[in-house]
Regions:
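Hydrophobic/aromatic-rich core segments of domains that either
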Residues: 26, 140-156, 165-175, 180-276, ...
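Short active-site neighborhood of thiol/selenol oxidoreductases, capturing the structured segment around
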Residues: 745-773, 786-790
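Short, ordered, surface-exposed loop/turn motifs in non-cytosolic proteins
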Residues: 276-277, 284-302, 319-321, 522, ...
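Secondary-structure boundary elements
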Residues: 28-183, 215-216, 390-555, 602
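Structured interaction patches on ligand/partner-binding surfaces of diverse proteins
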Residues: 330-354, 685-713
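Short, internal strand/loop/helix patches
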Residues: 802-837
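Thiol-/selenol-based redox modules, centered on thioredoxin-like
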Residues: 836-871
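Short, acidic Ser/Thr/Gly-rich low-complexity loop/linker segments typical of extracellular
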Residues: 298-317, 337, 642-667
Length: 871
């Protein structure tokens, strides 16, 4: 089991690693080194306060000084302000140690090592000592392997530690993911990249901003071996590289991005260069591509590029349709570009905000073109055996978490609310020792009420990685004048997507009592102080986590988002109720009369009350969709004065890469919006992956209600016979689902239509499919036709727990595909990948197939019902 390691519990390791290391140069390219030195000097001059560069006062060998300068020149400001220089020096020495001790260390080119091994940061996670911890766990497992096989082995190790589960958008640190034993795809891929880099293997996180064929996105990993990049699904080990459940969806992708630390001079197409990273497009590793000369920005912006002086820019993308959005000086224009069919597109900038109009168009994604590497049966069997053992290792660790029974026993012992304590302790998973220790300190009835209120204010993910000193700090929050605002807007430590810190004690120590009292009496004085003393550098923290409030205070420099978190944190520390609005991102002071917007550029109280109007949208229900979902079916964006779309966020609950509210919850009865111009985008996803979008431009007028229609476009002729399937095919019912003797689908289902699904076990695509089906439980039960869900073998069927997917229709029966139903579907429907699961069909007992889906598909339940209701 992973040892518990707090943020700086690596002091002993640090002392060892800080021993002098001899020193060749870290950067041997003289021209590149000069560029780094220039960028480092600029960065140092930009940050004169806070003694942030004290580590350079040490007597360091050339290699370490150059490596530190490289990191400090380009790392996000959060990594400079929130972590001591010794932390970064420790990781430099750990990286060098891995390069010296691993057999492939000397084969890694200098530039590949510099950009894809040395940096600790992968995305926007909190940094921790994972590099040191993981190396000690992994070194003996991989040191005798080839680089190719070591990549596979590290992924098996990651599977021992974590599996996929959706969660909110804040990215857990690698050690927190291990402690929790699960994570969303962005956290799994962060874990794998961190683990690979810990043993000196170059790795990078790759993501598609938006799948072209389905309403979701994904992140995975590329690792470098022997001169080329391979891809793999994080914590989802396969027998070979370049194989994952997402092969097929990736082959339909439009763009694949990765952010490379620092100034990168590789061969890939550069999307953008920032002071912190170089964003590159690696789509050519996955799909046939085409180039076009465009400026691109869409409703889920997949790319943003700047034109040259002639108004032109090129982009490489998969061969599908993309909406091109061009803006300049407040005007904008847009058009559809079919990549591969047209190489140039001229977009006329002839529209301005405030013009009401509606436009419909069709989007077709790239065709599937995945090239799967061969896997022989022996390889698959061995991989399955290993995965089963890894599941048992991880489950043994998970068994140490508090259960409902043990949590209730704990609650009884300390005279706590059993129901509430159990829910919170079980949700905290591997962090239960922190939450239970905090609860045990709650002795009086008042402290129990306050402590449990605090634990309910923070997010589910916070429960899994919050530190005890943070909870204690915020329990000591000062009372505000209005008790109704205290719990949510003063004591609550969570402001936005930052890592929680004990900032209230910090501000109590650094802000004088007189100043604190003055700010509480007149909060606009605090607004003025922040506006005057915190300098905004828009690009200082790109690619990083938000700077902590303590880090902003120390540096007196921040990006706007970190400044906003800083202000709200400082306000709450002085009993001033404040928040960042989750929808608009605005900073607001909270009063008994409502929210007052904060404008750091114009600090006048009367200017803060922006006029609002109201938006109401009617909706005429279409088949299978009573209540459209935000993000999946529609979005709202504000049209800015620059002619760009600013997406409004309406997030709800834990959902990978964002899950939102619905039409009924948001627009049926209306919602308040600032006055201005807006865009409503709706999109109907077709079974084949295409989209039927509609864009509605409208305005919100102060004090008035704007009424529009939310229309989900339909295509009545979509359902047709697309293949054949033998309804006499046999399967073996799972014990308890109709006996264990083989039955035909006709026997099991009777005459008429039925659904057949071939499932994998504990894989993200299957889990998504089952959750999507559960969401349509009532409609599928009302339809009344059987759904036969089969597993490839008895072992997987035995391990499947339907209780893990509450709400599945009662019309489901489970079984084992003992007679090759999956193979028949693949062959008859001419599917390209015999092993890609899940597979779903709707067929009838006349052997006609009217629907097929393979692999990763968001909204499967909806697609099934759309087909059913059009039969």
């Amino acid at each position: 089991m992973m040892k518990r390691i707090t943020r700086f519990s690596f002091l002993l390791v640090l002392m060892c690693l800080l021993a002098a290391c001899g020193g060749r140069s870290f950067i041997t390219d003289a021209a590149y080194r000069r560029r780094v030195e220039q960028d480092f000097s600029r960065r140092k001059a930009m940050l004169p306060q806070g003694d942030l560069f004290a580590v350079f006062d040490m007597d360091l060998p050339a290699y370490e000084r150059e490596a530190l300068e490289f990191l400090y020149a380009y790392m996000p400001l959060a990594d400079i302000a929130d972590y001591p220089g010794e932390f970064h020096l420790m990781n430099i020495r750990a990286s060098r140690k891995a390069a010296e001790e691993m057999p492939w260390g000397k084969t890694i080119p200098e530039d590949i090592f510099r950009h894809f091994v040395l940096p600790v940061r992968v995305n926007n996670e909190q940094l921790d000592s994972a590099r040191v911890v993981f190396y000690e766990e992994l070194k003996n497992r991989v040191k005798s392997l080839s680089l190719y096989d070591a990549i596979l082995e590290v992924n098996h190790w990651c599977h021992e530690k974590a599996v996929y589960t959706p969660s909110d958008s804040r990215t857990s640190s690698p050690l927190a993911t291990v402690r929790t034993a699960y994570g969303r795809c962005g956290e799994e891929s962060t874990l794998l990249v961190a683990a690979l880099r810990s043993v000196g293997i170059p790795a990078r996180q790759v993501y598609t901003p938006r799948w072209a064929h389905t309403d979701d996105n994904h992140a995975w990993v590329e690792a470098w071996a022997d001169g080329r990049w391979y891809f793999l699904g994080a914590c989802e080990p396969e027998p070979v590289l370049n194989l994952g459940w997402f092969n097929a969806p990736a082959s339909r992708g439009m763009l694949m991005h990765t952010k490379v630390f620092g100034r990168y001079e590789g061969a890939e197409e550069v999307m953008s260069v920032t002071p912190n990273y170089t964003e590159i497009n690696v789509v050519e590793n996955y799909v046939p591509t085409a180039k076009a000369t465009v400026t691109v920005e869409d409703e889920h912006t997949v790319a943003r590029k700047q034109t040259d002086e002639k108004g032109k820019v090129f982009l490489t993308a998969g061969k599908g349709d993309m909406l091109v959005w061009v803006s300049k000086d407040g005007k904008f224009g847009y058009a559809k570009l079919p990549f591969g069919k047209e190489s140039e597109l001229t977009v006329k900038i002839d529209k301005v905000a405030g013009e009401a109009h509606t436009v419909d168009f069709d989007i077709v994604p790239p065709p599937e073109s995945a090239d799967l590497p061969e896997v022989i049966s022996e390889q698959r069997a061995e991989n399955d055996r290993r995965m089963a053992r890894e599941d048992s290792i991880r489950n043994a660790y998970v068994s140490t978490f508090m259960t409902d029974e043990t949590a209730r026993e704990f609650a009884k012992r300390y005279k706590l609310d059993e129901e509430l304590a159990s829910r919170l302790l079980v949700a905290s998973r591997g962090n239960h020792w922190v939450i239970s220790d905090f609860m045990a300190r709650l002795r009086s009835e008042k402290s129990k009420r306050g402590g449990f209120d605090l634990l309910q204010q923070i997010s589910a993910k916070d429960l899994r990685d919050v530190r005890k000193e943070v909870l204690i700090d915020h329990m000591l929050s000062p009372m505000c004048k209005d008790n109704s605002l205290f719990s949510k807007y003063v004591r609550n430590p969570r402001v936005s997507n930052e890592m929680l810190t004990p900032y209230k004690t910090f501000f109590k120590d650094v802000v004088s009592k007189a100043d604190a009292e003055a700010y509480e009496a007149e909060p606009m004085k605090l607004v003025a102080w922040v506006a005057e003393h915190i300098r905004i550098e828009k690009e200082c923290n790109l690619g990083g986590a938000p700077i902590t409030p303590e880090g902003v205070w120390k540096a007196r420099v921040a990006d706007a988002h970190s400044r906003d978190i800083f202000f709200v944190s400082m306000a709450r520390s002085m009993a001033i109720p404040a928040r960042i609005d989750e929808v608009t991102g605005k900073v607001q002071l909270m009063t008994a009369n409502g929210a007052v917007d904060v404008n750091f550029d114009q600090v006048q109280p009367e200017s803060q009350m922006l006029q609002k109007g109201r938006l109401v949208a009617g909706y005429r229900s279409v088949a299978s969709l009573d209540d459209p979902k935000y993000y999946s079916h529609f979005t709202l964006s504000k049209l800015t004065s620059q002619g760009r779309l600013q997406l409004l966020s309406y997030d709800e609950g834990d959902a990978d890469m964002g899950g939102g509210t619905t039409w009924a919850g948001l627009l049926k009865n209306g919602t308040a919006l600032d006055a201005g111009s807006y865009v409503l985008v709706t999109g109907t996803r077709l079974a084949g992956g295409g989209v039927l979008p509609r864009i509605v431009f409208f305005s919100i007028v102060p004090g008035q209600t704007t009424e529009i229609e939310l229309v989900m476009r339909e295509r009545k002729d979509e359902v047709q016979v697309i293949g054949s399937f033998n309804s006499e095919s046999l399967f073996t019912p799972r014990s308890g689902d109709g006996g264990t003797d083989k039955r035909s689908l006709l026997q099991a289902c009777g005459r008429g239509y039925f659904v057949v699904g071939i499932l994998d076990l504990n894989q993200e695509p299957t889990n998504h499919a089952l959750c999507d089906i559960a969401a349509f439980k009532d409609k599928l039960e009302k339809w009344g036709r059987p759904m036969v869900l089969l597993f490839p073998d008895e072992a997987k069927a035995a391990k499947f727990a339907p209780a893990s997917f509450p709400g599945l229709p009662s019309t489901i029966c489970y079984g084992i595909d003992t007679d090759g139903i999956a193979e028949q579907i693949v062959n008859n429907m001419k599917l390209k990948h015999k092993e890609a699961l899940p597979i779903f069909i709707i067929a009838d007992t006349f052997n006609r197939v009217v629907f097929v889906s393979q692999g990763y598909t968001i909204g499967l339940g909806e697609q099934l019902m759309k087909t059913v209701e059009n039969l």
